[in-house]
């Protein structure tokens, strides 16, 4: 089994690359989706978050109020670290159950922080200019520039990814160009 990690800061444009990985025979595990599974109503992950951030992160029906959690979790680097420390063990356990294919791509913003990078044969980091990231985050999450800035500021700097990734891809331009480069990298890794 070959496991490839795909990571990078929020808004860098990792998600456009997953279809390429699937086309090349990789099972793609979207760790953001797994994270949502980890905090469904009455889950251990959600209970852990409530213990740390308080019951006001819940909607009236007992489900997670994502915006309320985001306001608290991204208000400071300490709170972001607390979010990751609380939730990552739950996410990691779910991800490990999904790694059941010859070729696996873990699409994971917190791949390195979770320790999942240690299970990877290679870690590909996707980076992009801050302005591009702001635009993508606002559009994707339907939030203000101020809220997008909070999310970027709460995340790891580019240097973190430069130090911890095997390969870096810069996603500032043409999506066809980046997907072609990504396909070349994955093909090379598969052939090792």
Where on the chain are the PLM-derived regions?
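Residue-level signal for inorganic ion chemistry
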Residues: 32, 83, 105, 148, ...
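Walker A/P-loop
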Residues: 15
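The conserved Walker
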Residues: 10
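NTP-dependent small-molecule kinase module
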Residues: 96-97, 101-103, 117-126, 131-143, ...
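Post-Walker A helix-loop "phosphate-sensing" segment adjacent to the P-loop in P-loop NTPases
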Residues: 23-31, 44
């Amino acid at each position: 089994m070959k496991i490839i990690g795909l990571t990078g800061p929020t808004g860098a444009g990792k998600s456009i690359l997953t279809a390429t990985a699937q086309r090349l025979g990789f099972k793609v595990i979207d760790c953001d989706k797994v994270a949502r599974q980890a905090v469904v109503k009455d889950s251990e992950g959600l209970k852990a978050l409530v213990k740390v951030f308080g019951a006001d992160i819940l909607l009236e029906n007992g489900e997670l109020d994502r915006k309320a959690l985001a306001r608290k979790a991204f208000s400071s680097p300490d709170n972001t670290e607390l979010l990751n420390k609380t939730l990552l063990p739950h996410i990691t356990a779910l991800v490990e159950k999904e790694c059941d294919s010859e070729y696996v791509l873990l699409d994971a913003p917190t791949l390195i922080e979770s320790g999942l990078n240690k299970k990877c044969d290679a870690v590909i980091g996707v980076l992009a200019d801050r302005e591009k990231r702001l635009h993508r985050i606002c559009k994707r999450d339907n939030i203000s520039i101020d809220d997008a800035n909070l999310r970027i500021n709460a995340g790891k700097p580019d240097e973190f990814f430069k130090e911890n990734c095997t390969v870096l891809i810069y996603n500032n331009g043409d999506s066809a160009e980046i997907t072609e480069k990504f396909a070349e990298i994955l093909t090379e890794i598969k052939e090792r």
